[in-house]
Amino acid sequence: TGVLTHSLLFWRSFAHLIGGMGVLVFALAIMNNSKNGHHEVMRAEVPGPVFGKVVAKLKNTAQILYIIYLTMFVIFAVILWLCGMPIFDSIITAMGGAGTGGFAVYNDSIAHYHSDLITYVVTVGTLLFGVNFNLYFYILLRKIKFFFQDEELRTYFAIVAISTGLIFLNIFGIYHSLADSFKYSFFEVSTIITTTGFGLTDITKWPLFSQYILLLLMFIGGSAGSTAGGFKVIRAMIIAKIARNQTLASLYPNRILSLHINGSVLDKETQHSVLKYLAVYVLIILSLVTILSLDNQNFLIVTSAAASTFNNIGPLLGTTDSFAIFSPLSKLIMGFAMIAGRLEIYPLLLLFLPKTWSKT
């Protein structure tokens, strides 16, 4: 625990539990009246390019999402406690997993407990919090098929499975058993793609191939409408489909092409919005990498530092040192990057729009 008291540990973790689903969504959930600007707040604070209401009223939507979120958090904490984790530790760890903030009680994070059972519970738990919470509402409505038919969900788990398999094949000679290799691969893929940042092993000792896979996952992130950060799986899917359609259009000029997500045509406005977000995202990452390179660190270190801070993950690749290797100026810039990345850029601008605060 270092020098932090239990009260400070709790407050730190509670802050990212509330922030995981969005402080503004939390405020909307407890508001009494529906005012102008709430739709923009909800749209901005629920990450991803496509915003959907699970019920007619935005206030009720926010309340339902938070009920699902907090219920999953309680279940997560109870399961960890039943697996042998002390009750305080289970609450702190569940907060870190639910909010995908990754703060733990001990400096060695999940590795402190030396328990495969706890490791797998944390792995699966963090993955579930990287899923779009609107999909869990389908489960409550007993519309299970809609949950499993979701295109982003299937892509999300496919990325996890493929990444875990590739890293497992790349590192299985490092550890004493195949079981350990799979455990570490699965855990690190889960904690990175969900931008949680829990620790279990020293990933800087892994081959560069595995580290670059993790770097790619840092950029992709979790699902839209989840507590995970990153670019989001749905945006990556849309970009890939736009690229495919543009390629086909060059080969078959007379062919009429449309972009579908979950069987529905995605409008041009949303496609353009995703492309604009990609442009801003890439510009910020390149700017961060350029500025951080002034500290004379190698490409993997500065790129992972940019990805880790802007996507709110935590781990640093390419070195066993911490972020202390960077200059005070770089740390200040990375601090601003963490704020902008957590808010997905646009909500930061939303705060300064008069329409958001209008009472009429």
Named regions from a protein language model:
Residues T1-T360:
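Membrane-proximal intracellular helices of multi-pass ion channels
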